A protein has these predicted regions:
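Alpha-helical transmembrane segments
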Residues: 7-21, 81-94, 125, 171-187, ...
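C-terminal functional modules
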Residues: 332, 337-380
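Transmembrane-helix bundle segments that line or gate the permeation/cavity pathway
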Residues: 23-31, 59-107, 123-151, 183-188, ...
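Membrane-interfacial helix termini and the short, flexible loops that connect transmembrane helices
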Residues: 29-43, 71-76, 98-119, 196-209, ...
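N-terminal signal-anchor module of multipass membrane proteins
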Residues: 1-58, 62-65
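Juxtamembrane helix-loop boundaries in multi-pass membrane proteins
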Residues: 42-62, 87, 113-127, 206-220, ...
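Short, membrane-exposed interhelical loops at transmembrane-helix boundaries
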Residues: 246-251, 318-338
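Long, contiguous internal "core" modules enriched in hydrophobic/ aromatic residues
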Residues: 107-287, 304
């Protein structure tokens, strides 16, 4: 039962992470604000389009972190407590986004509308790149070590220690972390462009968005394929199920796909959906539903990658400083009682998702138009 609960909560956390990557279309759209929005009217439509969804992304980010903390507290204390500069910059950029939406159109703001929109662009770049880089460490490893004997130390009962003074920023010195960060960034821009096509009724702007889809897709595929191929052919961090010893296994993540055919099927279906949504949007000028195909494909693809990082006797948060300090589902999770209690609460998740879909549908009943922006009402 305990093993089932560990795997169940890794599935929940992975699903939240996958949904978060999809919702980064808000950041991707904002990063294009000055690239696509050459007029004030276009920029206002873009800001109001993403402005109606930014709370979904922010809430999912917080929920993802909360679920990770509750189910795998040792990861939370190790990563959030050790790599705190990386996570603080990510969180600060999202707070900057929230402030920008709320204050850019308020009368008498001292910084001016353009400054707040620049903050949105900063979040649109920093958020996806650093989140992608943080997730990449699940496959490349981090610089930390753990000494559980310190739990008995009444003066310094700290069991997780970061191995350098960069506290997370050192992740950006690994080229493969940067590559996945860039892949997530360009994917977010693709998703943002597809979202604008679906959400804004302005031919000139949506034509620019289709060109942005094409250009950013090329860059996304280059970085994404490079990271995936490298990950599948490299050694992975395996766990001996009997002794819990962690060791390097050739082709570990490829082996995980082969030994978990359902996860492999999810990955392949996800990739096909991503490409279908992009391809049909580019080939058929009247097609505006690409965000849904590519969005669902993104969730399935990211979910499958996170599952191979933690399932099948794999260390999901490896340490290259001390291999035996690497975190696994078994050595970093909460107690069985805690996981079981939270599992009962998680039954409510489908109802929350249903409410989100209902709210989304209500907000997007009509596409955003220039006329709507000119008429006033609530706008950013």
């Amino acid at each position: 039962m305990y093993i089932f609960l560990q795997q169940y909560w890794w599935l929940v956390v992975s699903l939240l992470g996958a949904i978060l990557v999809f919702l980064l279309f808000v950041q991707g759209g904002n990063s294009l604000l000055f690239c696509l929005g050459k007029t004030e009217e276009h920029r206002k439509m873009m800001v109001n389009s993403t402005g109606r969804k930014w709370e979904f992304t922010f809430t999912t980010l917080v929920t993802f972190g909360g679920a990770f903390f509750a189910s795998f507290p040792l990861f939370y204390s190790t990563s959030f407590g050790g790599a705190y500069w990386l996570w603080m910059i990510i969180l600060f950029s999202f707070v900057l986004q929230a402030v920008s939406y709320e204050f850019q159109s308020k009368a008498g703001n001292l910084l001016g509308k353009k400054t707040y929109r620049t903050f949105l662009v900063i979040n649109g770049v920093v958020g996806p790149v650093l989140l992608g880089g943080a997730v990449a460490t699940f496959f490349t490893g981090s610089d930390f070590y753990i000494n559980k004997a310190n739990m008995t130390d009444t003066i310094m009962p700290v069991i997780s220690h970061w191995g350098n003074g960069w506290h997370g920023l050192d992740a950006l010195t690994n080229i493969w972390n940067v590559i996945l960060g860039l892949a997530v960034f360009f994917l977010a821009r693709v998703l943002g462009s597809l979202y604008f096509i679906n959400n804004i009724d302005d031919k000139e702007l949506t034509d620019k968005c289709r060109r942005a889809v094409r250009n950013n897709t090329v860059l996304f595929l280059v970085f994404f394929l490079a990271f995936v191929i490298r990950t599948l052919v490299s050694d992975g961090f395996a766990v001996n199920p009997d002794t819990q010893e962690i060791y390097m296994q050739p082709y570990k993540y490829l082996t995980n796909f082969i030994e978990m055919p359902v996860v492999l099927a999810l990955f392949l279906i996800g990739v096909v959906l991503v490409l279908f949504g992009i391809g049909k949007t580019l080939l058929k000028k009247t097609f505006d539903k690409g965000i849904w195909f590519t969005g669902i494909g993104t969730v399935l693809t990211v979910l499958s990658l996170l599952l191979i990082a933690g399932y099948n006797n794999t260390a999901y948060y490896p340490s290259y400083t001390d291999l035996q300090s690497s975190l696994t589902l078994a050595n970093s999770c909460s107690s069985e009682f805690t996981l079981k209690t939270m599992a009962y609460v998680s039954i409510l998740v489908p109802f929350v998702i249903a409410y989100i879909f209902y709210a989304w549908h209500s907000i997007d009943r009509h596409k955003i138009t220039e006329k709507e922006m000119d008429e006033g009402g609530h706008s950013y």
